[in-house]
Amino acid sequence: MKKALVFILILFAATISLTAKLIPVLDFTAFLTFDNTPGGIEGFDWRSANGLQNPQWWETKQDYWYDAFEKPAFLNLGFELDTDKVDMVVLVDVLQDIFVQIRDREKIYTNIPFLNKANLDLSFPRVGYIDYTSSEHLIYLSVGRRQIKWGPGTYGMAISDSQPYLDNVYFNVTSGISDRWKFSYDLVALAFKHYLDIGEEAEGAPQTTFAHRFSFSNPNFRISFTEMNNIYGKVPTFLDWTPIALWHNNYQDDCSNVIVDMAIEAKLGSVRLFGTLTMDDFRLAEEPNTNPTAIGASAGAEWNVISGNPFLGKEFSNSRYAIKDESFHVPGGLNLSYEFYYCSTYMYNRAVSAGKFTSDFQINSNVGPKKFYDDDAFFLGFKYGPGSIFHLLSLSYESTEYKIDFKASLLQRGSYYIDSPYDDEYKSKYDPLRLPGDVTTVLSIGSDFSYYPQGGIGMDVSVSYTRDLTHDSGAFKLYAGVKIAIADYLSH
């Protein structure tokens, strides 16, 4: 069997080599950061930690994880295989041990391995997939590890790029249905692994999340309807992911958490309008035994004030490989935008971790707790999670070689978290549509500047200040980095 498999792989490689283009990836990013953000709980305590990680600071453990993995890798090494219909990406991204970025708050640090008394993060790879595109782009299929982002805004409510990667199988079919209208159907399967300790499965495991979406679009308008089914505590069957039927009432309430989502985007001249409405549960007054109402919503507007040339600098982060929706966003020139997000108290939640719409993550750390597992490390949907309201104002300008943007945001978040108990007592403790308990208010302002005289060579500088108005504390961040895509540079 092994010999036959090897022979098939050799034959496949020989066949595609006739039409394939092999593109090496050798990207370096070196940066220095000053960050006096207060540190949080470190190590195994995070497994049972709930809410704020520091009593004088607004961040939860999900915020710490997101911030750590948002920083670029020191080295991306691998290749991209490009054929007429089949593409493949194999990538190893070399980071510092991720716990260094959490432990070394309140000081200057870099992403270069073996500095700051740190070695390599062993949790890679975070990108690796193969995909297929049929003639005329009718069918698309992707299998592997990469990010996915659905939705027209900066942040998604259903599936977002708030986690480093998702192990997934992705299928799409797109077809014209009239002179102006197109129809698109997406089907996605996401796999998660839940472990407390070696050989011991976490409560509620296994976990598999399915999503399907029906979309209609024309040159000025898009609307999509999404349904997500999180199956936990059992191995899924065809009933759980049957492609066309609705999943919301498949008689598996004890093993299934279903979310529905609607997204709209429209273009009116130089203005883009967009919004989403997401529902996890909805309780009527006559239904006291159901789960509490859980909804999310977003709305935004973007104005292309002055048209211009789009920025041509290379994207070095793993998000360049993400599966993302098409958008009416106009790149280049001056853009002004405002976005609003609301996520109610009980969104994404269930009594066991595997039932929540979260992404688990296992860290292999040689400077921290060695093998460490967090079952609610990232939100599958909205970055800031349930019980939150978020405002984002952005002004950006970009041309061929540089771009600059200014951002101001206001976050309000209650004190009931995704890790809080989800039982009968807590389901009735808070008004499901109001921010729960004590509310933390956070104001942040910042600016980013990128200059790339050549597409694969550039520098980034960013500065931001965050003020926790509730706890009367603040943090300043300064980032400066240089990037070079060596393979791209040598090819030119």
What positions do the PLM features span?
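Sec-dependent N-terminal signal peptides
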Residues: 4-14
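Outer-membrane beta-barrel channel domains
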Residues: 22-218, 289-295, 299, 308-330, ...
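Ser/Thr/Asn(+Pro)-rich, low-complexity disordered segments
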Residues: 82, 461-464
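C-terminal closing repeat unit and adjoining cap/tail of repeat-based domains
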Residues: 453-457
